[in-house]
């Protein structure tokens, strides 16, 4: 099986991709994983270190072909505040709980969590359930290339974006025990002015290799 051994960050490649893989947040943090692209190309992701991939990155195959990484839509909560000060206050409470959080211009996005939803509503936030790609902040110790997506990720190991110690465990455990079905038309997605993401269709199947 042909291997993908390097990663090109966002905006670092212009060639047409030979295939693409549709991956959620968890499956975008991998080192070695057998994958099948949306057009059927089978390959082995075989990186030097576990690397946090982002939508728009490219995996480089041994023969030079590229596989585009597409961030799959997943169930999220979009948290909206009344003003900038309120938004900062909400962000502080999420950060205090070590929740992976995506910071938007006027809102915050987290994975769906009914406990946290109740908490932020109690703090006066408006909460909307959406489905969109999840791209949380990498944290203060993330590599600059990971934070901005404009450098080659060939030999950088990245810590995970963060850990939710309330209800989710995002450690580097195997996801071989469950399947992801990403091949829908996404008719039930909520798209608003904050979304800004294209939703690619197709299936990508990933299996862990120890």
Curated annotation (Swiss-Prot):
Compositional bias annotation for Basic and acidic residues: 145-169, 178-196
Q: Where is the composition biased (Basic residues)?
A: 197-210
The record describes the protein's role as: Involved in urease metallocenter assembly. Binds nickel. Probably functions as a nickel donor during metallocenter assembly.
Q: Where is this region: Disordered?
A: 136-210
Q: Which family does it belong to?
A: Belongs to the UreE family.
Tell me, which GO biological process terms does this entry list? protein folding; protein-containing complex assembly; urea metabolic process
The Gene Ontology CC terms held by the record are: cytoplasm
Gene designation per UniProt: ureE
Key words, A-Z: Chaperone, Cytoplasm, Nickel, Nickel insertion
**What highest taxon heads this organism's lineage?**
Bacteria
Molecular function (Gene Ontology), one example: nickel cation binding
Q: Which organism is it from?
A: Bradyrhizobium sp. (strain ORS 278)
The record's annotation in InterPro entries points to: UreE, UreE_C_dom, UreE_N, UreE_N_sf
Keyword Cytoplasm among record annotations = yes
A Pfam match: UreE_C
Record protein name field: Urease accessory protein UreE
What is the annotated localization of this protein?
A: Cytoplasm
């Amino acid at each position: 099986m042909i291997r993908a051994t390097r990663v090109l960050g966002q905006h670092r490649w212009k060639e047409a991709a030979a295939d693409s893989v549709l991956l959620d947040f968890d499956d975008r943090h991998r080192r070695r994983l057998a994958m099948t692209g949306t057009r059927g190309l089978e390959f082995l992701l075989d990186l030097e270190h576990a690397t946090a991939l982002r939508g728009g990155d490219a995996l480089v195959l041994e023969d030079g072909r590229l596989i585009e990484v597409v961030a799959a839509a997943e169930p999220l909560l979009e948290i909206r505040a009344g003003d900038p000060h309120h938004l900062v206050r909400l962000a502080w409470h999420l950060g205090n709980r070590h929740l992976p959080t995506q910071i938007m211009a006027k809102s915050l996005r987290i994975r769906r969590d009914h406990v946290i939803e109740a908490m932020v509503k109690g703090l006066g936030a408006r909460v909307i359930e959406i489905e969109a790609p999840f791209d949380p902040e990498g944290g203060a110790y993330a590599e600059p290339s990971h934070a901005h997506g404009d450098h080659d990720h060939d030999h950088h190991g990245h810590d995970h974006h963060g850990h939710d110690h309330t209800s989710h465990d995002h450690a580097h455990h195997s996801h071989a025990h469950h399947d992801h079905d990403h091949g829908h038309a996404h008719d039930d997605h909520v798209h608003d002015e904050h979304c800004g993401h294209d939703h690619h269709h197709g299936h990508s199947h990933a299996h862990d290799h120890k």
